[in-house]
Design a protein with these regions (language model features):
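Formylglycine-dependent sulfatase
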Residues: 1-223
Length: 223
């Protein structure tokens, strides 16, 4: 099999995950106070895993496990990337992640949304050029992006109605929109742009909601 034939057998990959979304936050699982019609419909068309568990249901450790396939404690991610610790918690650049593997196998790689695997910039400087505050961080192009080429992301910030992002420079992008809607539109734009190329794409779409504060949703969802 030559390289061209091998490429033609690879499908595009879209991996969507949301922060803190668990069994109790889905209407399809019979939770009376939860209304998730889109997810319920999606579940009806796909496969629902009712016995799947995170090895470490905390933001940074879980994400590190997802990216590397390793237990979080084995890669030093015993808590979140945050300020106020003597140890600088972050996913080490030398770890081989799924983005690296996919890129090495001919995929165009993309990451959109919350990252929370890089050490907060205020651990190193009080007033970083990127404007990152508290647990947040701008991850510049290079090895700390773990194999992802297209990048529209941030470290950790929970203002869902007024999110910000970074791409390939320290200037913040502030769309003034609810983060899941903006990120979904950018993901669709990416897939429409790259879906017809010779090389397949692998896109990771990481929503922050339903991470608290829970009330930060557009008013129409209260109707």
């Amino acid at each position: 099999m030559n390289r061209k034939e091998s490429k033609s057998m690879k499908t595009n990959l879209l991996y969507i995950f949301a922060d803190q979304w668990r069994y109790q936050a889905l209407g399809v699982t019979g939770q009376d106070q939860v209304i998730t019609p889109a997810m319920d419909s999606f579940a009806g068309e796909g496969q629902v895993f009712t016995n799947a568990y995170s090895t470490f249901p905390l933001c940074t450790p879980h994400r590190g496990c997802l990216m590397t396939g390793k237990y979080p404690l084995s890669i030093g991610l015993w808590t979140n990337c945050k300020t106020g610790l003597e140890e600088k918690i972050m996913l080490k650049p030398q770890e081989t992640c799924i983005g690296n593997v996919l890129k090495d196998n001919g995929y165009r790689t993309a990451y959109i949304g919350k990252w929370h695997l890089d050490a907060p910039e205020q651990n190193f400087q009080e007033d970083p050029l990127s404007g990152a505050r508290d647990w947040d961080a701008y991850t510049p192009p290079g090895e700390r992006r773990q194999g992802f080429d297209y990048w529209l992301s941030y470290g950790a910030c929970d203002n869902h109605l007024d999110p910000h992002y970074w791409m390939d420079g320290p200037e913040q992008i502030r769309p003034g929109r609810w983060s899941p809607e903006f990120e979904t539109d950018k993901a669709i734009e990416y897939m429409e742009t790259h879906g017809g190329g010779e090389d397949p794409f692998a896109l990771f779409l990481s929503y922050n909601p339903p991470h608290l504060p829970y009330e930060l949703v557009p008013d129409r969802y209260y109707d």
